[in-house]
Amino acid sequence: MRRHKRWPLRSLVCSFSSSAAETVTTSTAASATAAFPLKHVTRSNFETTLNDLRSLVKAADFVAIDLEMTGVTSAPWRDSLEFDRYDVRYLKVKDSAEKFAVVQFGVCPFRWDSRTQSFVSYPHNFFVFPRQELTFDPPAHEFLCQTTSMDFLAKYQFDFNTCIHEGISYLSRREEEEASKRLKMLHGEDGIDSSGETEELKLVRLADVLFAARMEKLLNEWRSGLLHGGNASSEFPRISNGSNQSMETVFHHMRPALSLKGFTSHQLRVLNSVLRKHFGDLVYIHSNDKSSSSRDIVVYTDSDSDKENLMKEAKDERKRLAERKIQSAIGFRQVIDLLASEKKLIVGHNCFLDIAHVYSKFVGPLPSTAEKFVASINSHFPYIVDTKILLNVNPMLHQRMKKSSTSLSSAFSSLCPQIEFSSRSSDSFLQQRVNIDVEIDNVRCSNWNAGGKHEAGYDAFMTGCIFAQACNHLGFDFKQHSQLDDFAQNEKLEKYINRLYLSWTRGDIIDLRTGHSNADNWRVSKFKYENIVLIWNFPRKLKARGIKECICKAFGSASVTSVYHVDDSAVFVLFKNSELVWDFLALKRQLESSDGPVSVLHPLSKILEGGNTGAADYEAYKEICSSHVSEVMFSDQAETVGVKSRTRPNAQCETETREENTVTVTHKASDLIDAFLANRVEVETATSN
């Protein structure tokens, strides 16, 4: 079972001490009943956990992370496709990170314990939820939920109630900056006049006039009582029959004041207008008491200097309150700030999407290009290693993983069976295994049942275990502590650090230090993107094979290398060369503008049937993918974005002037039509004879 309704904080088979955790050997029977120790963190225990996590991260040799999200793709065509260029892959990752929410964040520091000759791991499972914490926030956060992802989470018993009700909220750095600016604008520089008005309020309604006169009379009586030692009673009677409004004498920072209760915001504005007009030594303040409860008061000041001091005190109080509100709203981002400030090696598994989510949720809006993203993320997290790349690139580990996939669970089972099943392996590859213990709240365990896969905290633990085992096979000698002093700078890891897959399924490997990308899939590297035409909104009865046949009849049997479906409404056509791309686009346009029989008889007529078929070069595909909109069908997406058919490459994409070539392309289109007609006449003549 993946999760219990009540999470065990301690395992009965684990012993502990108040000063240091001790690992003890337990019986096989006892260990068989031990649940995996995992620190679950919600709003209720976040602050105390964060304080403990600071010391754990500071002492860690590396930190493994993993995220659980509400979805991956906002439309079927936004999945990672075979013909996606590296910049398009980034745009699809960007779209995913911007539209879906993170609901769990796993953080697992790993520290080498020379005394026990083992790694000690500290798995934390944070529930996060983008709750609106600040009253002056923009409209509440919105995010998509992909049905397959939600079903996947439910299958593994994800606790949605805990996530929504107890999940830790957060502000990104950009949101924090904007919140600070909004607070300053909202409260003004003096921080006193809560109404924010600088002009005198004009009283039009009779009720306002009567209320102002009544307030002037009551305030004058109270002020006279203070000045002349008269009857400044501690509590005034109710303002009117049936009203809950009351005024009571209190003290505000050693100054006599009136506490106002039950007044509406409009009435307070009217009262404030009365004070400014008739009472120079009375000041209205909206403040907070020690319990952070707001209150409205009118304060008496005995001099101009005292009034200035009161205004300064109110301003400072509001500033402190604003800082507390924002600091509280930052929430889980403090964990991200901790990881960034400590500059530890961050370990993930197939983690480019995870890193994009980290940036989008906790730093700011994702940059428009992969190059800009790489430059920015590297300044926050200079050392990142992807265990999936480590397993695929290293020859020895790759040979090992040929027996199974490189998914997280498969890699964990293959490389760390002694950890997953708490048993010894006869596999010679694993004879020199790395021992890993788990410690939660000073309780250390070395035996447990397998935890809940696809729970972020446990997945982060598995990721760290895979990395530790891989390092062992790379030749790390953990007994020599000097090799761990600067884990990220170790030469054995140099070729793997800061190299991530630029997608969640397949694609290029991008170097976070340089921004350069190299295709790791031979099929991607075998063609040129300038040879691709994107066709959409053709008749649904046509499939890839039929489209290829139509084009080959018009341009020759060897003109098209392959046709690949984006979805049912669009295809990529890979031509033999780029000249054929522009020949096709020019011919399409000429056929569409013709009303003669050629447009009906031509082989391309099957593709153009209906008059709504669109076609453009690969740059149009990039433009469509860059849109924030996500229609289900690609043809609808192209129409929504407003991409039109193109017969010539964009000026910014040209590498040389094509003015003469454009004329040539047009002539070629005419030649193709003439050739088609001539061929048809010959065929008909031969048939008639």
From Swiss-Prot:
Widely expressed. Expressed in roots, stems, leaves and flowers. Its EC number is 3.1.13.4. Its main location: nucleus. It comes from the Eukaryota. The keyword Nucleus applies. The keyword Membrane does not apply. Gene3D superfamilies: Ribonuclease H-like superfamily/Ribonuclease H. It holds the Pfam family CAF1. GO terms for molecular function: cation binding; metal ion binding; poly(A)-specific ribonuclease activity; RNA binding. It catalyses: Exonucleolytic cleavage of poly(A) to 5'-AMP. One of its GO terms (biological process) is response to salicylic acid. GO terms for cellular component: mitochondrion; nucleus. Its cofactor is a divalent metal cation. Keywords: Cytoplasm, Exonuclease, Hydrolase, Metal-binding, mRNA processing, Nuclease, Nucleus, Plant defense, RNA-binding. A divalent metal cation binds at D66, E68, D354, D459. It is found in: Nucleus; Cytoplasm. Transmembrane segments: none annotated. Belongs to the CAF1 family. 3'-exoribonuclease that has a preference for poly(A) tails of mRNAs, thereby efficiently degrading poly(A) tails. Exonucleolytic degradation of the poly(A) tail is often the first step in the decay of eukaryotic mRNAs. Essential for early development, possibly by participating in silencing certain maternal mRNAs translationally. May have a pivotal role in stress response. This is Poly(A)-specific ribonuclease PARN. The gene is PARN.
